[in-house]
Swiss-Prot record:
The lineage of its organism: Eukaryota, Metazoa, Chordata, Craniata, Vertebrata. The keyword Phosphoprotein applies. Pfam families: BTG. PROSITE patterns: BTG_1, BTG_2. The gene is BTG1. One of its GO terms (molecular function) is enzyme binding. SMART domains: btg1 (SM00099). This is Protein BTG1. One of its GO terms (biological process) is negative regulation of cell population proliferation. The keyword 4Fe-4S does not apply.
Amino acid sequence: MHPFYSRAATMIGEIAAAVSFISKFLRTKGLTSERQLQTFSQSLQELLAEHYKHHWFPEKPCKGSGYRCIRINHKMDPLIGQAAQRIGLSSQELFRLLPSELTLWVDPYEVSYRIGEDGSICVLYEASPAGGSTQNSTNVQMVDSRISCKEELLLGRTSPSKNYNMMTVSG
């Protein structure tokens, strides 16, 4: 098997977790239909997979992390913007639906996020490499975030947060 295909297989869970997280913001506000959400999610998954395909290194998860980072900092991440355009969301609508400050790190075996520049970093998805590089040989868990992270998600805070302990779960 070509090395890219085995690498690509490992990013499926990570991309799905990131897309689900972003899509929840659109769903929470209730301004998009279920069909629009599905189209947005599918488009964003495809865009991220294409964007990451030569920058995914399961053997060195931190390599390329900056390239894979999804960032909203008063500017919209271009990949989120492209997916939103496909469902007819304007830039203004998208900025109303998403936090003005969001960083989402999509790395092999872990997806984490921070809302606000001084917010807590919360782990959204975690997997452990268990002897192989495909999804089937990986112990995968969705990580339940602490109440503080859920509050940040629901409120879309942009103000500095209090210091919270970060909880991670590994199998």
